[in-house]
């Protein structure tokens, strides 16, 4: 599985090593040409059968489990490759990314029901972004309300 990784994050010591190991595609979010290059590269790899992890918020922030604005451009990969989108809800991941300690952090990872091309193929990029975000937001609300037991993984 590949990762579309922001240049600023990728330049950090540990991240740089991980990027090399997983053959990540690095994207400079401040450079429009590089954004296009990276999205085209990811699209090509997805069409050839490789899976990619993309953070549509454009990076990690101290978000306190609140979704940030999704960057619609990253959904070009899915629209052009006509592949399913698997939304992933990450709960408490911000705690590990914005800390200067090596303390243990429990992060919940919820893989949601895949969204097939037949469900989003007629939508524009911005609409796909909102559709995916709404699915993740629904799961985040369930987690916050205690409706999802963190000790097991539930798909759907």
Residue ranges and their predicted role:
Residues 36-156:
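Non-catalytic C-terminal accessory region of glycerolipid acyltransferases
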Residues 1-32:
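Catalytic core of membrane glycerolipid acyltransferases/transacylases, capturing the structured
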């Amino acid at each position: 599985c590949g990762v579309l990784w922001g240049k600023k994050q990728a330049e950090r010591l540990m991240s740089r090593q991980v990027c090399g190991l997983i053959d990540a595609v690095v994207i400079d979010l401040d450079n429009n040409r590089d954004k296009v290059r990276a999205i085209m590269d990811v699209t090509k790899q997805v069409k050839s059968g490789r899976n990619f992890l993309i953070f549509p918020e454009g990076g990690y922030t101290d978000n306190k489990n609140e979704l940030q604005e999704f960057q619609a451009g990253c959904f070009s990969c899915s629209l052009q490759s006509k592949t399913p989108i698997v939304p992933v809800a990450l709960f408490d991941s911000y705690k590990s990314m914005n800390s200067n300690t090596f303390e243990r952090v429990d992060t919940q990872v919820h893989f949601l029901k895949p969204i097939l091309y037949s469900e989003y193929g007629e939508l524009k990029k911005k609409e796909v972004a909102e559709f995916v975000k709404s699915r993740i937001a629904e799961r985040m609300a369930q987690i916050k309300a205690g409706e999802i037991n963190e000790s097991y993984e539930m798909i759907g």
